[in-house]
Design a protein with these regions (language model features):
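Flexible "arm" and connector segments at domain edges
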Residues: 1-183
Length: 183
């Protein structure tokens, strides 16, 4: 597995800009606060897995033409993607990318460091706990390992993580615009 440095940095900046525009970087946004938000997203992976909420890619292909505009995309996303394990994987990665940009900006380096998921991690809960207990932190090395771990875990779960990160970024940006229109 090889992480795409340029793509990850682009996403990190995009996510950080969206988060800042939405006011998600207020006075409470310390590193500890951001790590706690990542932990809550990891918990949502466990919840989605427990409820067996998975994204069905065939539905996307079926309705792709009908959701060409932003409104159609948001409706589709809300109905078919929200609260799936696939979306929660993207949410964890986006929180990690936001933390990476917040802490390290352009100095962030992405590497996979030959990461593996330990053999004792057989269930979703065990993998989630390993991520939180053994990998998570705000250092360059820790964030990079967490992203690599998420890609490896997504691969095991047959989740197209790039697809879900791109779509969640689009959704977040559209929700940001909608929020501004309503206020």
């Amino acid at each position: 597995m090889r992480l795409d440095d340029k793509k990850l940095m682009t996403w990190a900046k995009r996510q950080h800009d969206i988060a800042a525009a939405n006011g998600w970087h207020g006075a409470m946004a310390s590193n500890a606060h951001m790590l706690a938000l990542i932990v809550t997203e990891v918990a949502e992976i466990i919840e989605a897995d427990r409820k067996e909420r998975r994204y069905d890619a065939s539905v996307f292909e079926k309705y792709k033409a009908q959701m060409g505009d932003d409104y159609g995309f948001v409706c589709f996303y809300d109905a078919e993607v929200k609260h799936t394990i696939d979306e929660e994987f993207a949410d964890v990665c986006l929180r990690l990318l936001d933390l990476a940009w917040d802490c390290h900006h352009e100095d962030m380096r992405w590497f996979d460091d030959n990461i593996s998921i330990p053999t004792y991690c057989r269930t979703t809960t065990e993998k989630a706990w390993h991520l939180i207990d053994k990998e998570l932190g705000w250092g360059v090395f820790q964030i990079a390992r967490c992203i690599a771990f998420m890609y490896l875990w997504a691969e095991q779960e047959h989740i197209d993580l790039d697809f879900h990160i791109e779509n969640k970024l689009r959704y977040n940006a559209l929700m940001s615009k909608e929020k501004k229109i309503k206020s």
